[in-house]
Structures are given as structure tokens and as C-alpha cells.
Amino acid sequence: MDNTSVQGTYADNFAIRCTEPVLTTNPATNAKYYIYNNYINGYYNGITTKLTFQSTITDNEVHMRPDNTNVWPAHFHSGIFIEATNDNLVTKNLVDMPSSNPLQWWHYGIFTAGSTTPKIKCNSTNYVGVGIIANGLNNTT
């Protein structure tokens, strides 16, 4: 997927977006996605999953588009973003920016928030403000 002629803004420009359209009462019934072997170039945000169960994100290359707006509030971007998910696997992915830039402090390689037992291993990040961040995890095992 190539987005060299950017479409959208930092808030709505995603290469792949996987979500559960209806909030379920049992997280085990949330959708499962297998996102693998994708080449993503020029998007502000690469892959996002929300309200999923046992999704797998593996062997992807995400080359993010920099947003050098240095104003508050900052424009947060993620190569891979996982939110409110259960038992996901994120492995063997490459997330990067084209070059180093001090204005890219709000760009995250892999970001997970509000998730239960995420498994994040063997990934590579380069030229992003934060490589891997885990926030508000709910590990019940």
C-alpha cells in the first residue's frame, strides 16, 4: 500500500483499520484478524486494531509519513496501534520513519492501550520518538 500522495490527515490516515463494529458483552466473541506480510508506505498511521480478540499482526513493514507540526496538541501517530483488545500477538514487524527528526517525539512505533495480555515480541523500530509503549494494560493471567 503506497500513499506517497497523502490522503487525509494525521487523525484519519490509516493503511489498515480493524475494529469490532458492535460492542460485545463477551470479549471472546470479538472479531479475529490476521494482518501479515504487508508493505505500507507513506501513511501517518499504519495498522490499527480496536476491540479485537486474538488478532495477529506479523511480518509487516510500516514506513510512516512524518508530520512535523510542532504545535500543541501534538499530532500523535503510530505504526501499529492496538486498543482495548484481548490476547493479541504483534511479532516480527518493522516500523520506521524516513529519517531522524527531533520533531518526531510524538510518533510511536508500536502502541498498545487498555489491552489484556498483549504479546509484543521480536519487532524493530527506527527513527520514531518511542519504539514500543504499553499503557493501561489489564493483564488477568
Predicted segment positions?
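All-beta strand scaffolds that present successive hydrophobic residues in beta-strands
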Residues: 1, 10, 30-37, 55-60, ...
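Extracellular beta-strand/beta-solenoid scaffold signature
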Residues: 7-30, 41-50, 59-85, 97-113, ...
